[in-house]
Amino acid sequence: GVSLAITDNRQLATTQGLAMSGKLEGAVHIMSNPSLKVLAGLQAVSEIGADVQGVALKVYLNNVLENLVGFKGLTGDLAGSVEISGNAALTDLDGFQSVTAATAATITNNANLITLHGLENVKTFDGEDPKGNSLTIRTNAALVDANALQELAVVSGGIDIDGNTNLQNVAGLIKGLTSATKVSIHNVICFSTSDETAFSLLATGDVNVEKVTSVTACEGNGK
């Protein structure tokens, strides 16, 4: 079920009045709040459950939401997946530093998300979304790198990265990764043959990647 749903509040600018703590049995949904700038009152929540779709935390279409530090109390292994989508003002994922695992992560259509900072301690995605993916990063136009994922080792399902037009490389993702099923990676500015080889060695399913043939694309990217 869902323990907290903040949805379709056109005027709500802050959740300062919330005072929740400890463990929430269900999921948290923060969706379609066009004026919400500040998430507060959740810092003492350490654990959340999941909804019937297996989603633990969904932050969707909050156009002016400045950050996710309101979730900094979350620790350990989340009971479901995390979906961060359509939040135009977010620049990073600061707030998840104490999270070490989730079933899956979907990070899509966050126009000003420059970095995945906040996911540095995530080591495992041990489930799949309905498409069979454990990690989906799509259409984040400002995203530059995946360096925050250097500790990520185990991905139980697929990896889908596409449409992040400023993504320089996925070196950070490759660094610690030991397993995944299918891998689909496109539109990365520097994606080399050695990157393809690395994914081919660890993936148990199809590897569908777009290599960059331009030498200049990888200059200055440590290739």
Labelled PLM ranges:
Residues 197-200, 222-223:
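Extracellular/mature segments of secreted proteins
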Residues 1-11, 17-36, 41-65, 70-90, ...:
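Concave beta-strand-loop units of leucine-rich repeat
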